[in-house]
Regions:
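Glycine- and acidic-residue-biased ligand/ion/polar-headgroup-sensing regions
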Residues: 50-67
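Well-ordered beta-strand positions in beta-sheet-rich domains
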Residues: 34, 75-77, 91, 99
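Double-stranded beta-helix
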Residues: 5-10, 14-15, 72, 95-132
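A short glycine-rich, His/Asp/Glu-containing loop-to-beta-strand
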Residues: 10-46, 51
């Protein structure tokens, strides 16, 4: 068996309109992040072409919007200790009711985002633009 070494990773933080994205792992295969969202902020309504992600709420309360399969948005309350898997193609948005802290694990498709506000007749909430 080949002898492999572990490597230290230096986390880095990106400031977003909604809070902070702290990268704690970044490899060609996966990303690990801590997301800190400010109360009253939301990410964009979006889906990913290739990115497969799971997020876990450590603290705070959030609303998760998702397409219910009929073209309508469903809103679900997310509480600490709950986790959601977002497969590629699933329309979703997270809105922080309180200050929230999430753990996110995903594939390494960082710039993979298609914004969907217009498709659902909603105003653009700002945030990151479509990359695909």
């Amino acid at each position: 068996m080949e002898n492999r070494r572990i490597e230290a990773y230096r986390p880095h933080t990106l400031i977003r309109d909604w809070g902070q994205e702290i990268f704690v792992a970044e490899t060609p295969h996966y990303l690990g992040k801590i997301l800190r969202m400010k109360a009253g902020t939301a990410g964009g309504l979006q889906y990913h072409v290739e990115k497969d992600e799971t997020f876990y709420l450590l603290s705070g309360r959030a609303l998760v919007r998702s397409d219910d399969g009929t073209g309508q948005l469903r809103v679900t309350m997310m509480l600490p200790g709950e986790s959601y898997h977002i497969p590629p193609g699933a329309v979703h948005q997270v809105e922080a009711i309180d200050d929230c802290v999430f753990v996110e694990a995903s594939t390494a498709h960082y710039d993979d985002r298609v914004r969907c506000e217009a498709q659902y007749g909603l105003p653009d909430t700002g945030g990151l633009p479509t990359t695909r």
